Amino acid sequence: MKFKYILILSALIGQILSLSAREVTSFNEGWLFKRGPFSQDPVKVAAQWNADWETVNLPHTWNAKDMQVKADAFYEGVGYYRKTQFFGNELKGKRVFLRFEGVGANTEVYVNGKLVGMHRGAYSAFAFEIGTALKLGAENEIMVKADNASRPDVIPVNHNLFGVYGGIYRPVWLIITEQNNITVTDCASPGVYITQKNVSKRSADITVKVKLDNGSLTPADLVLENTIYTQNGKKVTSHRLPLVLTPQGTQTYISTFKLNKPHLWQGRKAPYLYKVISRLLADGKVIDEVVQPLGVRRYEIVPGKGFYLNGEKYPMYGVTRHQDWWGLGSALTNKEHDFDLAQIMDIGATTVRFAHYQQSDYLYSRCDSLGLVIWAEIPFVNRVTGYEAENAQSQLRELIRQSFNHPSIYVWGLHNEVYQPHEYTAGLTQTLHNLAKTEDPDRYTVSVNGYGHAEHPVNQNADIQGMNRYFGWYEKKLQDIEPWVKGLEEKYPWQKLMLTEYGADANLDHQTEYLGDALNWGKSFYPETFQTKTHEYQWSVIAKHPYIIASYLWNMFDFGVPMWSRGGVPARNLKGLITFDRKIKKDSYYWYKANWSKDPVLYLTQRRNIDRERKHTSVTVYSNIGTPQVYLNGKELTGIRQGYTDVHYVLDDVTLEQGKNTIKTVATYNGKEYTDEIEWNYTGEKKRSADWSENKEEHAGW
């Protein structure tokens, strides 16, 4: 059976190669895996090396559970993956590559015992050419050594803000090309870079830069053809460039185009995508081909006024997203990515900060198609060691080159909440800014910290200044957001400012009506009602101040933090609007959906705060379909008032009956009746002693 399988696979590869010059196939099935800790190097101890392998398919992580259930009790270290693969003689004269989309965190790849490449960093892709190490007509062993132990020279330098899951947690691809190709190993990028200038409704100047590589010892007469197609596949324009490709390193070739009356990429309103196909031809035959998206758009930030897309004011309703899921860790399929994006679209968000690292390229591609405006960043976070500068630059270069053609990306994130020593952090941030501008002069850069004053030395080292402000949670009172933004607006009107994180934790098992204006996050009680109160007020302030160019609530989903134990749940950040398992949407989710989305929303809050503490209470309704009617035990209540925004409705001094109370709200919109209903239980007055003490300190990176 094994020989039959090899023959079938060999025939299949041969058939594929005869049909297409470049073949990209999944390399994710049938891996063997073993995890440490190891008392000795298992590669050097035959008995240890040959025993106890587990069969796995990729994506895979060894931390799917232990990083999520107990604080500081997870495995970080080495894991090995092995895969035996037959490569037929028909590959003679071809070039063979392996492309890894993401391995946590530091990787060595071996083919038949030979080291073919090393990579440092958990979140960017990397590609190695393996052809010279292969034995054609035979089985070959691919071995991957992954290590997610923290290192001072690789960012992130710790697991403090989020866990770096170990393993080959994103897909792997086998790539086969001719000797002359569009380069595969330029930081694992597509090898094609599309830039746009002078974008308007009248015209746009498009430049397509292609990097070619000759893997032989002979110059080749070739033709490079770059063609732009409409979304429906109709050819718009094309350019052919005859060339002689020498075998002396990667060569760069450029085609320029002017698109007249281009169909613009207009965010969620109209995310129109052209397609650019770069083809390499020899003797009239296509020997390589790469397809990339082209969304024709122009981003502009005007201090004090807002964000503009193609000259039109564009609302920046922002959320953030960590990539891990409960029970899966970071080993996600496209199904999980699509689910997360569906929730982000449903809430009405227009922009996403994918934090705090490069995320799946599939995710960025979907954002291109959905019209979401994207912030992409590197994991330079939390702490510095003085040894990470080279790796930070490497990861930024990889992020930019791999993600260069995504029209959804408007900004490159350089750092997040990196503190002492300030001079080192500021200097490295400036270096990263300069690198980003060299690689991509047309996009913005941003750096982020928790210092809320512009004159701090780590500020003002990028195009955009991001500030994480957790008023009422980590610092001061939740209402202090307004004097903060007013002060900056008056003192620094020229500043491009974004509120890059804000919010509060919410454990759904914790509920209360007794709410102050600040919560002691060091205690274990994290009520959902305080999170709701925080978002209600703070979004209302943000919405009134265009000086805040964009705001990004923290976070769309609860996520794992393996070094934490807070709010009654170990290894968890509870600031999400949706629970870690993606099953429950918190009240705050519907607050933003009512404010942002065009879909009808009618929602009663505090549905989990069932056991009421007060006989005289209030009822809150979110409605973007007009003033709702509210009923208590079948009787209509009067005196409804407008709250912080025009979707916020409050009824004060509602008197509950002893026992079960049914609250119902009704609204009619476009001839359709909408309803929502919840139940509360009142059994007598209850007093709660809670620590609502105000934190006088400035937020500094928790």
Predicted regions mapped to residue ranges:
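Short, solvent-exposed loop/linker segments at the N-terminal edge
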Residues: Q196-A204, N609-K615
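Extracellular Ig-like/FN3 beta-sandwich strand-entry sites
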Residues: G137-E139, S203, P219-D221, T250, ...
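Accessory beta-strand-rich segments of carbohydrate-active enzymes
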Residues: L32-P37, E76-T185, S189-G191, G215, ...
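Signal that preferentially marks extracellular ectodomain short beta-strand elements
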Residues: F128-L134, I254-P271, L651-V654
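Bacterial Sec-dependent N-terminal signal peptides
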Residues: M1-E23
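Beta-strand-rich binding/interaction modules
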Residues: V111, K201-V244, Q251-Y253, T617-G639, ...
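Extracellular and select intracellular beta-sandwich modules with Ser/Thr-enriched
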Residues: I168, T237-H239, Y253, I287-V291, ...
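Extended substrate-binding grooves/exosites of carbohydrate-active enzymes
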Residues: T55-V69, A149-P152, L161, Y165, ...
